[in-house]
Amino acid sequence: MRKIFIGCLLLVALAANAHSAQQPSTGVPSKLVKVRDDFFMIENINATVADIGSYGGNIAVYLTDEGVVLVDSKNERTHDDVVAKVRSLTDKPIKYVVLTHNHGDHAGGAPKMQAIGATILISVNDRENMARAPNVAWVPQFGYVGRAQLVMGGKEVRLYEVRGHTRGDTAAYFPAARVVAMGDLLTTSEDIPLIVNYPDGGSWMDWSKSVDEILQLDFDVAIPGHGPMVTKQQVVNIRNKMVAIRERVRTMNREKKTQQEITDTLIKEFNWGMGPSAGNVPAMMQELR
């Protein structure tokens, strides 16, 4: 039996080895990585900023006797690759796609998933972010607020709405598998820095609070938005680094340091503050004043 228990749900109408089975070749640089017997990750091999728009982020794949739950959908271009990889694991239908947030490299493939019968879930806050984007053509039918629960084939998925990368990030927790999928609350690729999206309501102050909340969950493996999966201790290490960066900015703000001085210090001390993260520096300075 499939169930959705969404106490706060609003109906908004309108390190493991690559999977050993033969993986379909579709021209998309991705691979299946086995996490558990019933849990896999579709990892973008080219985890670089230049390839985000073309190939999207990671996807979590949870297998049940009644169907498949995905976390994130990459983008429209990668749809056939995602479906082929799921089909290499099971002939059960993709029943649910949980979107960790509204950005196209994670949510862009959702319309095609809906077209093949999947129900799409996202937080109401990030649904609203999606709806106000220029020239928006589609938004998910269902949104939730705060907490939600999916049960399908006797397996549970718990959804936690938190603020960090955006104002309505979703962390998807799989208790039986001891896995949490965090979207862009967590990135582990050396080429894609962890950043906050301020235009979509993100916050570095709330990011650490949200990660601390997630760390209270009983998990062994975290699936990031980009990059390889990591252990819980590695999440702690990343959290501590980003808090150290934040507090360094706070201190230098008080010392009346310039943006360039702060940026130079962050690059030197943390190897952070260049490339995509450079745009976070002035916004972080403003948030921490």
Residue ranges and their predicted role:
Residues 7-15:
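Bacterial N-terminal signal peptides
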Residues 34-85, 172-173, 178-183:
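Conserved beta-strand hairpin/beta-sheet module of binuclear metal-dependent hydrolase folds
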Residues 22-35, 67-69, 75-77, 116, 124-168, 175-176, ...:
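Metallo-beta-lactamase
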